[in-house]
Amino acid sequence: MTSTPKPLVLIILDGFGHSEVPEHNAIFAANTPVYDRLRATLPHGLISGSGMDVGLPDGQMGNSEVGHMNLGAGRVVYQDFTRVTKAIRDGEFFKNPVLTGAVDKAASAGKAVHILGLLSDGGVHSHQDHLVAMAELAAQRGAEKIYLHAFLDGRDTPPRSAQSSIELLDATFAKLGKGRIASLIGRYYAMDRDNRWDRVSAAYNLIVDSAAEYTADTAQAGLEAAYARDESDEFVKATRIGEAVKVEDGDAVVFMNFRADRARELSRAFVEPDFTEFARARLPKMAAYIGLTQYSAKIPAPAAFAPSSLNNVLGEYLAKNGKTQLRIAETEKYAHVTFFFSGGREEPFEGEERILIPSPKVATYDLQPEMNAPQVTDRIVEAIEQQRFDVIVVNYANGDMVGHTGVFEAAVKAVEALDTCVGRIVDALEKVGGEALITADHGNVEQMEDECTGQAHTAHTTEPVPFIYVGKRNLKVRDGGVLADVAPTMLQLLGLEKPVEMTGTSILVDA
């Protein structure tokens, strides 16, 4: 019999950062007796989940994909954002054979290049500098018809902040002497990830057939009209800009988001021959449909930047050592606790089980701030009591998903719901002698108002995240930890040597 405490639970509180500023801080405002008690009585500290510490540009806020990659890999994972930006700076982007091949096919036949993507400086799913570079590449290679179908952000950026991004792209096209913004739509429609196909169909029909609820002469005018209708960037309805632009046979389409999870549904509509999620009015015979990165191995679209493989991530190494593991989350974060935590692998490892709890079907999560966290917790408590698993990895989506709504009162309720859930897990572990690590992937809910603009702060933050050890061992939390140190910490608690690929080091040291 092993003497290792069982199970070891990694609790990832999504979007749950730490800020010393009490104003507009949903964690500070919430009643959190469990969290307060754990921090008062157990080894705890703060670790970094942003910038260079997670493989992003310095000062860039973290996000869920990046956070889970680093948590599961046990090493700093240099992100697609960083790879693409570097390629643009050193000129390799403009020689990328996937991108140049697609553009050349269309341009040589006098056809159009359509650029799709989130027009934003948020850096979470995309970056506007990448869209600028793609427009420049298309122009350099002789494309005369270059159209940007812009998805507006307002979620990883302030709710009404798209004007400067539109101005940047308008200026880019003016400088190039060709190309223009052809359509606007909020990311709520174009970048769904929860099978709300009515939203995706609005984006698809806008891009392919220029079918729009609204029209405007310029993108600036379209944005102003949306604001007059009280639509913030995220929720801007399908708007045609200028003369109708359709995706015709022989055109090339390039999707410039680098993050996969919110690019999959729209991409499927473009490339799956037997697509049935909604009735496509038309499926053009494109010269090429390209993703900036690989959105899924199952989506038949070449990637300009192919995934770099990660070996001996935590899940794989646990399987090699005969350990069992459970991954559990609700829909919104299921991909993060499985695909991203496993280093970009879709299939479970040997001895790995997965539980998906459907997210509630509400328009926005401020309407149900507890989401389905209680049901997630029911399944975790059950798994702890059964003692079938050596390791349980759970993601609670509330801090991030409710934080993104910008509704402070709802965010406070979300934090209080999390506190109750964590308390139930800690109680269940106490009964069986298990252990837990409580942390987060990035900040969000600790800052709910932008101190500069006074607008709701709906984006992630660069704040550090909590790290708490729940267990009986005489340990303390060292300073200077990062997300990549969490997997090595778990291996230490499990009594396993870390593999050579894991360059992170344990956050827990002898007290």
UniProtKB/Swiss-Prot annotation:
Chain positions recorded as Mn(2+) 2 binding sites: D14, S64, D441, H442
Task performed by this protein: Catalyzes the interconversion of 2-phosphoglycerate and 3-phosphoglycerate.
NCBIfam families, per database record: pgm_bpd_ind
Record flagged with keyword S-adenosyl-L-methionine: no
Cofactor note: Binds 2 manganese ions per subunit.
GO BP: glucose catabolic process; glycolytic process
Pathway: Carbohydrate degradation; glycolysis; pyruvate from D-glyceraldehyde 3-phosphate: step 3/5
Annotated InterPro entries: Alkaline_phosphatase_core_sf, BPG-indep_PGM_N, Metalloenzyme, PGAM_B_sf, Pgm_bpd_ind
Cofactor(s) the record lists: Mn(2+)
Encoding gene per record: gpmI
Catalytic center residues: S64
Similarity section: Belongs to the BPG-independent phosphoglycerate mutase family.
GO molecular function: manganese ion binding; phosphoglycerate mutase activity
Catalytic activity reported: (2R)-2-phosphoglycerate = (2R)-3-phosphoglycerate
Source organism, top-level taxon: Bacteria
Entry binding sites for Mn(2+) 1: D400, H404, H460
Enzyme Commission code: 5.4.2.12
Entry protein name: 2,3-bisphosphoglycerate-independent phosphoglycerate mutase
Residue positions binding substrate: H125, R155, D156, R187, R193, R259, A260, D261, R262, K333
Subunit structure: Monomer.
CDD domains reported in the protein's UniProt record: iPGM
UniProt entry keywords in alphabetical sequence: Glycolysis, Isomerase, Manganese, Metal-binding
One cellular component term from this protein's GO annotations in UniProt: cytosol
